[in-house]
Amino acid sequence: MMNSCTPNKKSSYSYEDLLASGRGELFGEDGPQLPAPTMLMMDRIVEMNETGGQFNKGYIEAELDIKPDLPFFGCHFIGDPVMPGCLGLDAMWQLVGFYLGWIGGKGKGRALGVGEVKFTGQILPSAKKVVYRIHMKRVINRKLVMGMADGEVEVDGRVIYTATDLKVGLFQDTSAF
C-alpha cells in the first residue's frame, strides 16, 4: 500500500543515502530496501521526479563509478573481465523498487519480470561511468503495489542495454511468493 507521507523525499541521493536505504532507514522499516554492497549497483541517484521521462510518469537517473577492483571483475571472467549483464538489469529493477518507496509504497520489493532486454555492448574495467535511466510507465496501487518502466544502461556515453516493461512489486508478505 502507499503512504501519502514519504519522509526523505528528495530529487537526488548520495551513496550514504543508498546505504541507509539498504538498512531500512530511508523509507522506514516497512518500506522497500536497496541491497547492500556488493549487490548495490549504483553509487548515487542524480535525478528523480514524478512527472518526467518518456511517458511523463516519473524518471530516475543513477550512476555507478567503474573501478577495476569491483568484485565481479575478478571472477567474470578470469582473463576476460566484464560486468555481468544481469547486474545491469538488476540495477534497473533496484531503481524501479526505489522509486516505489520514494512515492510512498510499502512492502518488500521483488522483481516480477521484464518484457524484453537487449545487450549491445559491455562494461569493462577500463570504463569510467555507468548511467542508468528509468522511465516509469505505470504504478498500480492496490493490494500489491507494482511499478512498470522502461530503462537503459549507458557506459561512457554509449547506450549498451535496453529493457522494456521492467516490473517490480512490493509485497507485505513474501512467504507465498
Curated annotation (Swiss-Prot):
Is Ion transport one of the keywords UniProt gives this record? no
Q: In which pathway does it act?
A: Lipid metabolism; fatty acid biosynthesis
Predominantly, its location class is cytoplasm
List the EC numbers from the record: 4.2.1.59, 5.3.3.14
Any single Gene Ontology cellular-component annotation: cytoplasm
Which positions are catalytic residues? 76
The answer, when asked if Signal is one of the entry's keywords, is no
InterPro entries from the xrefs? Answer: FabA, FabA_FabZ, HotDog_dom_sf
Q: Where in the cell is it found?
A: Cytoplasm
Main function: Necessary for the introduction of cis unsaturation into fatty acids. Catalyzes the dehydration of (3R)-3-hydroxydecanoyl-ACP to E-(2)-decenoyl-ACP and then its isomerization to Z-(3)-decenoyl-ACP. Can catalyze the dehydratase reaction for beta-hydroxyacyl-ACPs with saturated chain lengths up to 16:0, being most active on intermediate chain length.
Q: Which family does it belong to?
A: Belongs to the thioester dehydratase family. FabA subfamily.
* Annotated protein name in UniProt: 3-hydroxydecanoyl-[acyl-carrier-protein] dehydratase
Provenance organism: Pasteurella multocida (strain Pm70)
